[in-house]
Amino acid sequence: HDYISGIHHHGAHQGEYVTHHDHPVTIDAVHGARILDSRGYPTVRVSLELDDGRTVTGDAPAGASTGAHEAVELRDGGSAFGGRDVTQALHLIDTDISGLLTGRSWSAIGQIDAALAELDGTTGYRRLGANSVVATSIAASRALAHAADLPLWQWIAEITGSTPRMPVPHFNVLNGGAHAANELDFQEFMIAPVNAGSMADAVRIGADVYHALAALVRDRFGSLGLGDEGG
């Protein structure tokens, strides 16, 4: 869900992007769909049909907790999925966002993000929903990467002027706060194997630490509770 707060600032800093690598893309159709996240709650998927026949998608991440300054997800309320359904967001994707994006040539992600922010017209995406906007922006990024004939990671590196590197996996090994029924003040205790020799080695280190920690907790407290994010 941190990505949703990040998208609020994306268009405002479009001047930071290197645009000479961008290739224009024309979007023929925009569709919203409901998918389920890892907790079994709905989130938003946006599909963009491009004029060359390619379809790209973007999925909005969602979290159990929301920061005070985080952009606002659009949820239905009511009884379906505990009030977390996204039919309103899907309707706005299929109507307002589709009307904005289709039939035009787009050449930069900052251009698209700024247009989405203007269409929304509120602070924190309260009208369209940050879940609608971030899924659209992710799909649009994939569309522009496709137009440039680049994998997404390389396209991001080129427009930001950054040097690609393998990510370091982060493991959430203990949960507290809103993520667990305990008295821990910290919501997430995470480890990152920064000096691992490879991604496979980093994953092994994370798994070894997780299971060793579980054994210590079981020995000391007699049982294990499973937090909202697996810790």
Segment roles from a protein language model:
Residues W106-I112, A130, L152-W155, A214-G231:
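Flexible, glycine/charged-enriched surface loops at secondary-structure junctions
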